[in-house]
């Protein structure tokens, strides 16, 4: 495809019918296509996340990123909104599920939608991607180094989160997981634990682990960026969504 696309800020119906700001990117043309909900990382609804959203449009998908911190600090700069959300303990799981469900419904209501929607999240969004796929009708999920899908947050961790072990039997979509072997949250041992739990419940999943990569290896604007891991990860994501979403 040509890669031509358009992007805009929209409003969607989120949890409990709340109006939520979101960033929508769409490829040009009327071809039938799947959709991708992008869950932003802990630093928030920032330029890097919007670039990722546009990248999915360039790949041929309708893509949307809801601003999960919209209620905490409407109109605030990403860093300020993220700080406010952290001070509030992070995004409650129930609210996250409702906002992602609203984003998925928005994508399915667009002209040209083939009805298939995937979700992807980075950092805290990786855990939230798995959470969403355990509670919402989705067709594919990608977890990029999401912490505390298994395991327990350390003392002093700013977000009020618990692991998803009790929810994993409800995982309703194939899962692609991308992890760095130098990460601590999730650690390689935690990735292995997650792999074993999913296998025990016969959940379709595909994990890839990268040496010389830790947390946030996709983040091009951070010292944690690792070119080889990120490039391979994007190839895995592209192939996975092509299979599961019909792209």
Describe the function of each predicted region.
Residues 1-247:
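N-terminal cap/leader regions of alpha/beta-hydrolase-fold enzymes
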């Amino acid at each position: 495809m040509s890669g031509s696309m358009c992007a805009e800020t929209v409003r969607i119906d989120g949890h409990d019918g709340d109006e939520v700001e979101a960033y929508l990117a769409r490829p040009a043309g009327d071809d039938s296509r799947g959709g991708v909900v992008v869950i932003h990382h802990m630093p928030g609804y920032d330029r890097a996340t919007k670039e990722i959203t546009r990248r999915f449009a360039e790949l041929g998908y309708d893509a949307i990123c809801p601003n999960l911190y919209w209620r905490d600090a409407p109109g605030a700069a990403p860093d300020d909104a993220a700080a406010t959300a952290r001070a509030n303990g992070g995004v409650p799981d129930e609210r996250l599920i409702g906002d992602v469900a609203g984003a998925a419904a928005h994508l399915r209501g667009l002209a040209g939608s083939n009805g298939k929607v995937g979700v992807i999240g980075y950092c805290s969004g990786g855990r939230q991607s798995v959470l969403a796929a355990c509670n919402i009708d989705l067709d594919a999920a990608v977890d990029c180094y999401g912490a505390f899908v298994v395991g327990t947050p350390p003392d002093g961790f700013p977000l009020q989160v618990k692991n998803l072990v009790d929810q994993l039997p409800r995982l309703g979509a194939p899962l692609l997981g991308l992890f760095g072997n130098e990460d601590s949250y999730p650690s390689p041992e935690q990735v292995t634990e997650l792999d074993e739990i999913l296998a025990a419940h016969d959940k379709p999943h595909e994990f890839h682990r990268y040496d010389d990569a830790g947390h946030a290896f996709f983040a091009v604007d951070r010292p944690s960026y690792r070119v080889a891991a990120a490039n391979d990860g994007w190839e895995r994501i592209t192939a996975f969504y092509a299979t599961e979403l019909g792209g």
